């Protein structure tokens, strides 16, 4: 099975209780857990290079999460590597490593690599989890992400999110501006362009399976097309010609339908499209602007923003358009709601005005309408912060962040991520300006 990582053995070692308390990643801010990712044993030079690179990726994944503090290899005392021996735990405790990762890489006759790892609790001197993976060389990075995911899940109790992709809009800094749909790993690696930049493109969206995307393309000023692109084959097809559309559709959880906003006759409304028949069904009524629809994880409800009461606020309705309820009640204008994959929170952009002008904010609120009076929480603010999207485990939010032009530097737009708690804000490196991020589910 080329180009697919598969697990030979789902669990190599029995899981035992351990001294470390499970990290609560929703409430408060905990000190990062110190972890040593030891050099991976290798049976030849090719495996050694691969192992060295994998250790860097695993360490970086854990560090970026904000929940782990990888210890520098320069401080390691024990020199043994691999999974065939029991570590000298006292040596690892001496450098304050609560967790230890040992691993090995072997090149198989098939040309693939067998990668094994064990996560140890150095305090109780117990194995926590271990696995064997078999991968082709070109997927070594995904194998490293898979290992980091397993470590993250074991310690936090939540699924990891490292083996994922981000699709976004890349914009050149030179004039004329060229916008292209781009795809990269969650950490900014393996960036590649999916469109050629000949037309204006906006708001890429993943399908549930992460092997397809939607995006909006302005073929001409009057002709706006929605494309569906297969990421495995590269083939594109036109979903429809929607002159009044402003954002790409969002897929339903079952992948059979999608929702979008379309402007007609002075009003903008939410429509659902059946992807098989291409038939549209209007979900909102009345006057005003209704935009940015997003399904709940179970597909039974839709959140969107509407100015039906004068100022853009957030509303929830059933997926058939019934039982509309307002869920935002704070001052300012709300936009771009995004439902967490866990179903518990909705992320949003909020624009407020003060003496210094407009301020953009990213916030979260509970998805239950009756709980929402004064329950929203702002997690980051700036000159321009917008387009929040969720990690597949619902614990990290990615968004676009912009700065204005000045006499010293031109304006710029970049992609950032931040924890649900509002801590650990970090930039996701891209080769050019970037906006409109969308996070895939965990890859198969």
UniProtKB/Swiss-Prot annotation:
Signal peptide start and end residues: 1-19
Keywords: Cell cycle, Cell division, Periplasm, Signal
Domain of life: Bacteria
Record carries keyword Signal: yes
Cellular component, GO, one term: periplasmic space
Pfam families: PD40, TolB_N
Coiled coil: none
InterPro entries membership: 6-blade_b-propeller_TolB-like (IPR011042), PD40 (IPR011659), Tol-Pal_TolB (IPR014167), TolB_N (IPR007195)
Alphabetized SUPFAM superfamilies for the sequence: TolB, N-terminal domain (SSF52964), Tricorn protease N-terminal domain (SSF69304)
Broad class of the protein's primary localization: periplasm
Subcellular location: Periplasm
UniProt entry tagged with the keyword Membrane: no
A single BP term in Gene Ontology: cell division
NCBIfam families, A to Z: propeller_TolB
Quaternary context: The Tol-Pal system is composed of five core proteins: the inner membrane proteins TolA, TolQ and TolR, the periplasmic protein TolB and the outer membrane protein Pal. They form a network linking the inner and outer membranes and the peptidoglycan layer.
Protein role: Part of the Tol-Pal system, which plays a role in outer membrane invagination during cell division and is important for maintaining outer membrane integrity.
Family, as annotated: Belongs to the TolB family.
Protein name: Tol-Pal system protein TolB
Annotated source species: Rickettsia rickettsii (strain Iowa)
């Amino acid at each position: 099975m080329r180009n697919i990582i598969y697990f030979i053995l789902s669990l190599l070692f029995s899981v035992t209780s351990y001294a470390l308390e499970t990290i609560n990643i929703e409430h408060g801010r905990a000190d990062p857990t110190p972890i040593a990712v030891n050099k991976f044993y290798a049976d030849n030079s090719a495996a050694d290079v691969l192992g060295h690179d994998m250790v860097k990726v695993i360490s970086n994944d854990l560090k970026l999460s904000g929940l782990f503090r990888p210890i520098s290899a320069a401080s390691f005392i024990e020199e043994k590597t691999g999974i065939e021996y029991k570590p000298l735990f006292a040596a690892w405790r001496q450098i304050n490593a609560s967790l230890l990762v040992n691993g090995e890489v072997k090149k198989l006759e098939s040309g693939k690599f067998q990668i094994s790892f064990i996560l140890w609790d150095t305090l109780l001197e117990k194995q926590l989890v271990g696995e064997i993976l078999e991968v082709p060389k070109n997927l070594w990075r995904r194998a490293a992400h898979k290992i980091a995911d397993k470590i993250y899940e074991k310690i936090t109790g939540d699924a990891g999110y490292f083996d994922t992709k981000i699709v976004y809009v890349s914009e050149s800094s030179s004039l004329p501006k060229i916008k292209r749909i781009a795809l990269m790993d969650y950490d900014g690696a393996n960036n590649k362009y999916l469109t050629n930049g000949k037309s204006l493109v906006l708001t890429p969206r993943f399908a549930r399976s992460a092997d397809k995307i939607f995006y909006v393309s302005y073929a001409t000023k009057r002709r706006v097309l929605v494309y569906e692109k297969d990421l495995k084959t590269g083939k594109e097809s036109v979903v429809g010609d929607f002159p009044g559309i402003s954002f790409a559709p969002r897929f339903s959880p079952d992948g059979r339908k999608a929702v979008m906003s379309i402007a007609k006759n002075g009003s903008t409304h939410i429509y659902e499209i059946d992807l098989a028949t291409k038939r549209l069904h209007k979900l909102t009524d009345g006057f005003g602007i209704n935009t940015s629809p997003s399904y709940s994880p179970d597909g039974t409800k839709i959140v969107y923003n509407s100015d039906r009461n004068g100022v853009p606020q957030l509303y929830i309705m059933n997926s058939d358009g019934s039982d509309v309820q307002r869920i935002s009640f704070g001052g300012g204008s709300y936009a771009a709601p995004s439902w967490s994959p866990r179903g518990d929170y909705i992320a949003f952009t909020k624009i407020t005005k003060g003496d210094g002008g407009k301020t953009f904010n990213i916030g979260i609120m509970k998805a239950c309408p009756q709980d929402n009076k004064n329950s929203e929480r702002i997690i980051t603010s700036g000159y321009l912060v917008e387009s929040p999207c969720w990690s597949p485990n619902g614990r990290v939010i990615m968004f676009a962040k912009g700065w204005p032009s000045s006499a010293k530097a031109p304006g710029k737009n970049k992609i950032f991520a931040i924890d649900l708690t509002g801590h650990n804000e970090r930039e996701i490196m891209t080769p050019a300006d970037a906006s409109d991020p969308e996070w895939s589910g965990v890859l198969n």
